């Protein structure tokens, strides 16, 4: 009798489990799991990465921008149709932009679900958050370029990270300018070690004062090294180069007494090679001040109402034209000319490509813009 009872009990449990399993199966069929828009974008990116791992011959060979259809991922059975991924998938469209820059590939999912959700670039978000002004602090516009000026507090971006006390901590940057849908950022921290701009023997000076020719300098090598070792203070510092645009740097020369009104002399000459990292220029620093007495790079008034003003020393890549060794550097609240063989910090600049997309934040130091 006890065996019969035990047998019936086991049978009941098995039957219950089968019914439960069948119910879960029916539930999954009639109530499929849907994802958020952000989760869907991540799924599309992962499916695209797998697609090209399986089809490496399909990767673009030349630098540029390319498109991949969402349907190609569905046909490869790497992702479900959009109406099975998103609850409103029938009203959405999706595509993938592939960007090749040197040896780096970027995969950018683009979702369009009308008013409900559309993948948004960081540039669009910044311009939506900031009305262009013509006085005081804020976002200015000149000849198609947007730039921040004054004591602004909403132009912070978190990009890259390092580990501190077993916690992932983001690097903070300030937005300097926006041009051609690309965003120039300046790091709020230095790279962790001082470098000389150039220490070669200068035959013109008969001493090891270095030369102020950027294309043949040592600082260009230091900037290039940042591509593999971004920060010497943190060994595990990470920067995603696929989000950046390699650019020819503005290396035109100017004099300490050249007035701000002369404009961006630095960009009249560009570096021979393209770089992912650069430095701020004296013109950009002067332009960021709203003090009317900021008339040239040596004006102490330039530190007033200027979000780019520092308390640390830093190199620029800008040289003077009146000698073969002088370099602009920021120190003691002003720009001065130093010999190239001097050791100073680098606060690097980068350019986010037009494919940097908004992923959260309001631009404050407490809640900086996030990108993906």
Predicted regions span which residues?
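Structured segments of extracytoplasmic/periplasmic soluble domains
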Residues: 47-54, 76-77, 178, 188, ...
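Long, compositionally biased
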Residues: 94-117
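Conserved hydrophobic/amphipathic alpha-helical signal-anchor segments
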Residues: 27, 31-66
């Amino acid at each position: 009798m006890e065996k019969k009872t035990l047998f019936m009990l086991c049978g009941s449990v098995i039957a219950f489990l089968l019914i439960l399993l069948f119910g879960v199966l029916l539930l999954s069929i009639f109530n499929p799991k849907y994802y958020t828009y952000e989760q869907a974008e991540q799924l599309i990116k992962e499916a695209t990465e797998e697609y090209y791992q399986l089809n490496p011959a399909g990767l673009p060979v030349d630098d540029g921008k390319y498109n991949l259809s969402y349907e190609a991922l569905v046909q490869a059975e790497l992702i479900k149709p959009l109406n099975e991924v998103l609850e409103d998938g029938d009203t959405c469209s999706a595509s993938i932009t592939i960007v090749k820059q040197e040896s780096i590939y970027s995969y950018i999912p683009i979702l369009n679900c009308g008013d409900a959700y559309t993948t948004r670039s960081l540039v669009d978000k910044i311009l939506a958050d900031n009305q262009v002004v013509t006085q005081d602090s804020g976002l200015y516009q000149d000849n198609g370029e947007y730039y921040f000026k004054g004591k602004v507090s909403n132009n912070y971006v978190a990009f890259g990270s390092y580990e501190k006390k077993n916690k992932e901590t983001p690097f903070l940057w300030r937005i300097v300018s926006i041009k051609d849908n690309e965003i120039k950022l300046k790091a709020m921290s230095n790279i962790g070690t001082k470098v000389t701009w150039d220490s070669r023997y200068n035959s013109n000076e008969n001493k090891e004062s270095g030369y102020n020719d950027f294309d043949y300098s040592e600082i260009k090598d230091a900037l290039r090294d940042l591509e593999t070792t971004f920060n010497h203070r943190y060994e595990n510092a990470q920067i995603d180069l696929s989000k950046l645009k390699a650019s020819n740097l503005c290396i035109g020369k100017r004099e300490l007494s050249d007035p701000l009104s002369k404009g961006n002399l630095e960009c009249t000459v560009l570096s021979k090679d393209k770089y992912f990292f650069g430095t701020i220029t004296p013109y950009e620093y002067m332009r960021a001040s709203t003090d009317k007495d900021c008339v040239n790079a040596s004006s102490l008034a330039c530190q007033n109402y200027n979000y780019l003003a520092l308390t640390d020393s830093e190199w620029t890549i800008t040289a003077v034209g009146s000698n073969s060794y002088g370099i602009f550097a920021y120190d003691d609240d002003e720009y001065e000319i130093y010999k190239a063989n001097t050791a100073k910090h680098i606060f690097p600049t980068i350019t986010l490509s037009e494919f940097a997309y908004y992923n959260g934040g309001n631009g404050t130091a407490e809640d900086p813009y996030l990108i993906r």
